[in-house]
């Protein structure tokens, strides 16, 4: 029984810090990249609109919870005349197997921040000052990154056009606190899957590269958690006095986006995110003599829709 409790606690901690804090600080800058005449974002100062972000999460294949958050965007210009969306979060709730938790207070506590799909703008993730809003803020940013100039989306012109990034991106998401060591290695591609009179459909895929760009913390990380796929994720968290949890494995995700040609707004989008890990619990400072090991998988199904 004690072991089960520890496993449950470890899983809960893990799920708080996964995903987009890993990859996207490296894709924050738009400046100097081309716009798209076909579906590039056309901003109108003063325009106000809202998005609903829904995320369903499964642990080891079983439903765990659903998060629903709503944000409001207002188009402004910065001091350089570059258009931005000012993002304000206005509500959030979590639905699990037992009850519904209202986290609107946390959503309203997030300071407004700016993001832009303009070629001269930025898509920086803001400093996270409200921990309960970490996931929706980062997920929302991902949907914008997936159709941005940084991944090459604005270079696509006709159905079937695609771009594959040949150089993997490595990100360090260590924070010196509850993430003592954290790295992720991702390659990505973007493809125009369809085009209609009024809309463009884009598929952006983030996946493990063919060769690792990580220096693994322990030799066994060279053995794939998922057969025939390199491990591209590693992380160390403290679990007690001179005790640590080591996690490693495979992460990938893809985003299907529908963009309105007239103004370049994302009308709706879906994201599938899968993480398959091996957890080593309560290890010593050399990450040996661990109390136990366990596999863990997390699947997240997300949907963004304009309101």
Where are each of the predicted segments found?
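Bacterial Sec-dependent N-terminal signal peptides
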Residues: 1-35
């Amino acid at each position: 029984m004690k072991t089960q409790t520890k496993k449950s606690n470890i899983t809960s901690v893990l799920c708080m810090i996964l995903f987009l804090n890993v990859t996207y600080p490296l894709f924050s800058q738009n400046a100097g990249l081309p716009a798209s005449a076909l579906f590039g974002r056309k901003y109108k100062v003063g325009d106000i609109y809202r998005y609903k972000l829904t995320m369903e999460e499964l642990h080891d294949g079983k439903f765990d919870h659903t998060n629903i958050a709503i944000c409001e965007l207002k188009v402004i210009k910065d001091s350089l005349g570059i258009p931005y969306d000012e993002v304000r979060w206005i509500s959030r709730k979590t639905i699990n197997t037992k009850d519904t938790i209202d986290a609107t207070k946390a959503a309203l506590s997030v300071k407004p921040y700016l993001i832009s799909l303009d070629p001269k703008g930025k898509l920086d993730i803001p400093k996270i000052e409200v921990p309960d809003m970490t996931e929706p803020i980062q997920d929302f940013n991902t949907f914008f990154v997936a159709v941005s100039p940084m991944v090459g989306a604005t270079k696509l012109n006709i159905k079937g056009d695609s771009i594959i990034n040949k150089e993997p991106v490595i990100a360090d998401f260590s924070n010196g606190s509850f993430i003592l060591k954290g790295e992720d290695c991702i390659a990505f591609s973007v493809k125009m899957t369809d085009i209609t009179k009024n809309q463009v459909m884009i598929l952006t895929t983030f996946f493990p590269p063919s060769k690792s760009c990580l220096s693994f913390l322990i030799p066994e990380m060279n053995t794939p958690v998922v057969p025939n796929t390199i491990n591209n994720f590693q992380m160390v968290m403290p679990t007690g006095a001179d005790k640590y949890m080591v996690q490693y494995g495979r992460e990938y995700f893809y985003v299907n986006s529908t963009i309105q040609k007239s103004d370049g707004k994302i009308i709706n989008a879906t994201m599938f995110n899968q993480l398959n890990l091996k957890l080593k619990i309560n290890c010593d400072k050399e990450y040996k003599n661990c109390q136990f090991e366990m596999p863990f998988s997390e699947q997240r199904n997300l949907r963004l829709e304009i309101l």
